[in-house]
Amino acid sequence: MSERLSGHTLLVSLLATPIRHSLSPKMHNEAYAKLGLDYAYLAFEVGTEQLADAVQGIRALGIRGSNVSMPNKEAILPLLDDLSPAAELVGAVNTVVNKDGKGHLVGHITDGIGALRALADEGVSVKNKIITLAGVGGAGKAIAVQLAFDGAKEVRLFNRQATRLSSVQKLVTKLNQLTRTKVTLQDLEDQTAFKEAIRESHLFIDATSVGMKPLENLSLITDPELIRPDLVVFDIVYSPAETKLLAFARQHGAQKVINGLGMVLYQGAEAFKLITGQDMPVDAIKPLLGDE
């Protein structure tokens, strides 16, 4: 990358913590090189305490855009000038665009688009399907919105944090008003309801952090009877590539198991397009993600 850097190079950033596991710098910098774009992508260890200063830095330095990940997806909202309709509905942002480097920052959310493109890539359609989704943080809410917009029959949301349930219920109400999808929300602590939902679902999506370190030895599903030959299991975690959940589902005969690498690729491709105006060469970038 050093050979490409010049006084004209445009900077794109990632604001998150931790960042060591992130595939984004590799993915975006390789895409810039493939397309001959004079951009550089750098990851910065930024938590919520440093976030306001970091956002001001984007404005002051003319950084052209930034990806935003945990724990900043919701905390960044009041620091931006505008939100896309999807980001406003979800209440979270994972991409910030500084158009022309003039300091007017617009927040977008590409997680839902990325997840649905990843599923489509695996031949999985959500239209008219019953789907159970665990975890309604920034990514989970974005996926829920996209599932409803893409014509799922039912989306059954489960979340463990009782304090978040009331805010997510507002999103549920909006989705039931705006789409034909039936969206419900329940506490993940209600294991009876959780298991019943999975038994009736075509697709189970884990959008929690269970499966990542330090929770890599845990799985939301531990009952073999919940895994059926017609059930697709999608875990948005990508490191490790096979979480405890995916290994369990594969072992007990799930129709298909999908990790989060495809979602990373396609949400990144959408962010890439928003910031650069160019299509990411996903076919060239996809093989690189398997090197991790």
From Swiss-Prot:
InterPro entries: Aminoacid_DH-like_N_sf, NAD(P)-bd_dom_sf, SDH_C, Shikimate_DH, Shikimate_DH-bd_N, Shikimate_DH_fam
UniProt enzyme class: oxidoreductase
Keywords for the protein's UniProt record, in alphabetical order: Amino-acid biosynthesis, Aromatic amino acid biosynthesis, NADP, Oxidoreductase
GO molecular function: NADP binding; shikimate 3-dehydrogenase (NADP+) activity
Enzyme active site: 73
Similarity field: Belongs to the shikimate dehydrogenase family.
UniProt-listed Pfam families: SDH_C, Shikimate_dh_N
Catalysed reactions, as listed in the record: shikimate + NADP(+) = 3-dehydroshikimate + NADPH + H(+)
Binding-site residues, NADP(+): 135-139, 236, 260
Subunit relationships: Homodimer.
Task performed by this protein: Involved in the biosynthesis of the chorismate, which leads to the biosynthesis of aromatic amino acids. Catalyzes the reversible NADPH linked reduction of 3-dehydroshikimate (DHSA) to yield shikimate (SA).
Protein name: Shikimate dehydrogenase (NADP(+))
Enzyme nomenclature, EC number: 1.1.1.25
The protein's annotated pathway: Metabolic intermediate biosynthesis; chorismate biosynthesis; chorismate from D-erythrose 4-phosphate and phosphoenolpyruvate: step 4/7
Domain of life the protein comes from: Bacteria
